[in-house]
């Protein structure tokens, strides 16, 4: 399926379905793979589904759905399969063998095909199986198997977290002899949701008989919280509380030499995330962080790049980080252009995809330097610079420490202009060296903030001096004295502050 993205704001989400309801994204494994590619020249996404070692049961109607924001489109197609003529006999029990490696892709269980082959094996006649509705239940009549057995097997069909194949049915015999110890045995298989409880019930012929319960061949010990044994008349009950994935196993009830077996499947709930991954565009060497926040505890999160899973052993450039059970991160410390691509985070029942574009660093031109400022106290100081790329971000630092905006300090980035504004300048706090450092570039633009000092000398206010010059009587302009006699002039002088008296004779000071 090809999707044109030239008119789309975000990458489209494509899902594949078989029939009306089966999401093939939950069936990805060694027999079914989903791939996607992107052509930057034509801006076309190509989504592909690959079926490996196809079986006749894969035949049917398929649907592909593409969703992007408010746009939706879908297309339907049919797949026809031709079964090989050399059928041969099939050992149904060997097909149900559970592997011990515990991996998800250890095998896949195709109940539709197995039930058909089992009918052929037991009755040697062709049969037709019907699968309709949701969930799928397969019905049929057979002299070799009861309808309840078919329902239990079909009940397991579509489990997404199956990590191995059934071991229980391997031990089933073609012709089971009638049990003398059990009136009613365990059903072939049970299913329970994670966190719930389940009861396994058998009926014994002897009401005084003692039974043993085993899990994967090991005796189960009774406990108050996890395993509870009950004996009510002919019934023997094993209750398993708070089921986890560790309880997904084979169980058996033993009376003397007789045993009955069952298989318990613990189904994980579908997980979701509060926010999808976001597309990112960074420069070479700039740190990348993808964040995923899951809705439930215990979710197994898997990261992929272009459809290939990222593991700790294979990805030296990637780092996985968890913050509690809710948040998980994919970190790329020093990305290169090769790290560009589609990144996917997956968990049971949910996935999200984002694009990462890593670009080479361009040459950044400085169109306007940061100028030194000289201001007075309580004035406004504005540092401003302009660079050639409006997408370049950066930080302001003062004396080597990052400037944090507050009520007085404002930082703005408008287009190519970066501005730092300081209101009500305080000499002790704001004076210093300021620099703007653009992200991803090894240089900075610096300036100084200085203050204009105004010196004022304080002169205390003084009263004008007061001088009292009292001359007794009218003073003559000319005084005549007989030569040889002494001249005495009495002039009373007072004042505030005390005046200094200077006598002069002509132009000479006496």
From Swiss-Prot:
Annotated Pfam families: I-set, THB
Coiled-coil segments on the chain, per record: none
Tissue expression: Heart.
Record's keyword annotation contains Repeat: yes
Ig-like C2-type domain mapped to chain residues: 177-269, 270-347, 378-438
Gene3D superfamilies named in the record: Immunoglobulins
UniProt keyword list: Actin-binding, Cell adhesion, Immunoglobulin domain, Muscle protein, Repeat, Thick filament
GO biological process: cell adhesion; sarcomere organization; ventricular cardiac muscle tissue morphogenesis
Record GO cellular component, one term: M band
Superkingdom of this protein's organism: Eukaryota
GO molecular function: actin binding; myosin heavy chain binding
Family of this protein: Belongs to the immunoglobulin superfamily. MyBP family.
Function: Thick filament-associated protein located in the crossbridge region of vertebrate striated muscle a bands. In vitro it binds MHC, F-actin and native thin filaments, and modifies the activity of actin-activated myosin ATPase. It may modulate muscle contraction or may play a more structural role.
Name recorded for this polypeptide: Myosin-binding protein C, cardiac-type
Species in which this protein is naturally found: Ambystoma mexicanum (Axolotl)
Lineage of origin: Eukaryota, Metazoa, Chordata, Craniata, Vertebrata
